[in-house]
């Protein structure tokens, strides 16, 4: 894009006299990534203000600076002043990437719990149905079947546009993406339209960022308020915030409600059987909450025009998301406890998973729960997670999660405040030792839930990420137990 076209697209408040000749780009928001000819856009972040790095960007070779304030420089740089760079970055990133979002049918899934599983189920089902689909989410980033690293639930607008461009070039027709409340509040999903948007549920999470549950809900609603009349919203009306999400939106609304258009036919440790709009789905996924995930995935695929029976058949044969109620076992050993790894890191999610395991357990089968809470996040949920564990687990080991910059022992102390009694509660700060202890203590008949990190392959301590995977650690402990090592 040349400077003239850039200015015309932006429609700025002011521009400097200097206008560089020829093409400019790429677009960057981190001055450390600036190369010769870059367009640097200064974003006011929650911790860092990009306007502090205008001089650094120029020094590194930026030819265009986009900012929210008057800025003078002697350098041969075009300075473009706008009212709000955050609202501009999404549309501009799309424009400079060739508007890849316009060439994809985009499905957005938002909610506190179930985003990853629902989005993954839609991706897997559409792929099974023969569509060319890509996926962006917490666990996986997939361009068709190629897996890439996924760092955030929803990437920044520049990375998002670049990913979409790669997807289009690879032949993708659909993009299924998780949409976080942070991304919506920070306008990270601007510059393209959603074909279908889905709401799973809403409960306490991220209140360190949004401050109140009302602000958190309002951030989620941005996704639905932005839908066009030709788009569709799939909304879980069994959640107390379903009506709020649907209120006043322009799109068509497809409502999910168990007892109305969906039913749970059976729910056991072997899996689920549900009916949605008259179509039966038999899945290896377990738990009442997965009934909602399967039903929403079904309704999303139906909104995209697929045959109901074919959707049901596809969903009956897909595995779901890694680290979501994922079973860990040894191929050759059956005389070992059943180990489940799950990402549950909110009070609601932990309660749902434990309740599911409790409902499916047999007589004299104990449930061990290993969990912690993340540092530098909403501390109010820590004691609530303890209450959830106490209600459904027989033996509890409280440990570290991702303490980040916090002291893990202080996080554990916050959690302990939620226990009415600690008779069956042990604290072990080392997560590896906690997992080993649970597997050492459990009998072959018991169930062990390792909650909080799911698919993650790291543990963040003092701001650094160290290799750590609950599934690999559990497998190591199971191998030791199988050899009689405890």
Question: For each predicted feature, which ranges?
Answer:
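Short, active-site-adjacent cap segments at secondary-structure transitions
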Residues: 72-73, 140-143, 183-185, 240-244, ...
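Phosphate-binding loop of NTP-binding sites
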Residues: 10-13, 89-237, 241-252, 301-302, ...
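ATP-dependent carboxylate-amine ligase
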Residues: 1-15, 36-39, 52, 296-309, ...
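Short, ordered loop/turn segments at secondary-structure junctions
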Residues: 69-71, 138-139, 181, 202, ...
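N-terminal leader/targeting and accessory segments in enzymes
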Residues: 1-91, 232, 282, 286-288, ...
């Amino acid at each position: 894009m040349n400077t003239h076209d850039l200015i015309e697209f932006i429609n700025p408040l002011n521009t400097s006299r200097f206008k560089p000749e020829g093409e400019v780009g790429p677009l960057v928001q981190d001055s450390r990534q600036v190369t010769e000819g870059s367009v640097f856009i200064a974003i006011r972040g929650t911790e860092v203000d990009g306007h502090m790095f205008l001089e650094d960007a120029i020094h590194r070779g930026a030819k265009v600076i986009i900012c929210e304030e008057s800025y003078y420089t002697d350098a041969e740089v075009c300075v473009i002043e706008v009212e709000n760079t955050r609202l501009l970055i999404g549309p501009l990133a799309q424009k400079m990437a060739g508007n890849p979002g316009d060439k994809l049918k985009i499905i957005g899934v938002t909610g506190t719990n179930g985003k990853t599983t629902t989005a993954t189920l839609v991706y897997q089902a559409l792929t099974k149905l023969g569509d060319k689909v890509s996926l962006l989410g917490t666990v996986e980033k997939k361009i068709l079947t190629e897996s890439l690293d996924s760092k955030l639930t929803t990437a920044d607008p520049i990375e998002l546009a670049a990913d979409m461009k790669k997807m289009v070039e690879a032949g993708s027709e659909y993009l299924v993406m998780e949409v976080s409340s942070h991304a919506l509040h920070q306008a990270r999903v601007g510059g393209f339209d959603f074909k279908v948007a889905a709401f799973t549920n809403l409960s306490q999470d991220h209140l360190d960022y949004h401050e109140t549950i009302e602000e958190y809900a309002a951030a989620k609603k941005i996704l639905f308020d932005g839908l066009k009349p030709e788009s569709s919203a799939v909304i879980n009306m069994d959640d107390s915030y379903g009506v709020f999400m649907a209120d006043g939106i322009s799109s068509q609304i497809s409502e999910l409600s168990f007892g109305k258009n969906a039913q749970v036919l059976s729910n056991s440790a072997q899996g689920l059987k549900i009916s949605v709009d008259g179509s039966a789905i038999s899945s290896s996924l377990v738990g009442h909450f997965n009934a909602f995930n399967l039903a929403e995935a079904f309704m999303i695929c139906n909104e995209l025009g697929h045959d109901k029976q074919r959707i049901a058949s596809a969903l009956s044969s897909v595995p779901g998301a890694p680290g979501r109620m994922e079973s860990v076992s040894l191929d050759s050993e059956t005389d070992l406890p059943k180990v489940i790894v799950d990402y549950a890191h909110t009070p609601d999610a932990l309660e749902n998973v434990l309740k599911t395991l409790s409902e499916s357990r047999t007589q004299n089968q104990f449930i061990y729960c290993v969990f912690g809470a993340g540092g530098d996040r909403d501390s109010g949920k820590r004691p609530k997670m303890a209450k959830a564990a106490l209600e459904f687990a027989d033996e509890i080991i409280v440990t570290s999660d991702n303490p980040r910059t916090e002291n893990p022992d202080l996080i554990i102390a916050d959690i302990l405040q939620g226990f009415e009694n600690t008779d069956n509660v042990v604290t072990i700060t080392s997560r590896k030792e906690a997992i080993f202890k649970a597997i050492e203590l459990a009998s072959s008949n018991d169930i062990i839930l390792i909650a909080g990190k799911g698919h993650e392959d790291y543990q963040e301590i003092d701001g650094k990420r160290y290799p750590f995977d609950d599934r690999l650690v559990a497998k190591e402990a199971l191998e030791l137990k199988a050899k009689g090592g405890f």
